Design a protein with these regions (language model features):
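An N-terminal assembly and electron-transfer interface module characteristic of large anaerobic redox
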Residues: 1-129
Length: 129
């Protein structure tokens, strides 16, 4: 997930992509098959399209990663397309407020009754991933 404003997305895109790559790498190193999105969800259209595309792959678990602030409705749109278990994962970084975005998304998903779990911390720590 990423910020929906184009001028902010440009500034955080590389950070968000690097964080996603690190998470995917850690999961793959542990033997998990990772089905990645085509990029950060930063518009309503992308959230809906990617949510449907990933749901069609029928993953055992869908992880919404929040490396930076993200508008909660992106999570609601993507979650609407997914049917399996959902994990909201946020980094804790003073420069990039990913946890704030994850908490906002979690509240939005609670409001629509979409079950999910939440995890947060330094993604480089084994206790987090």
């Amino acid at each position: 997930m990423s910020d929906g404003r184009d001028f902010v997305e440009r500034d955080v895109h590389d950070f968000a992509t690097a964080a996603e790559t690190a998470i995917a790498g850690r999961l793959e190193a542990e033997g998990h098959e990772v089905i990645r999105g085509d990029g950060p969800l930063w518009t309503s259209e992308v959230a809906t399209t990617e949510g449907r595309r990933l749901a069609d792959a029928r993953p055992d678990l869908t992880i919404f990663h929040y490396p930076v602030w993200a508008f909660p409705h992106f999570s609601m749109l993507a979650a609407e397309a997914s049917r399996g278990p959902l994990l909201l994962l946020a980094n804790v970084d003073p420069q990039f407020p990913g946890m704030v975005g994850m908490l906002a998304a979690g509240g939005a998903l609670d409001q629509i009754g979409r079950a999910h779990a939440r995890a947060w911390g330094d993604i480089r720590e084994s206790a987090v991933l």
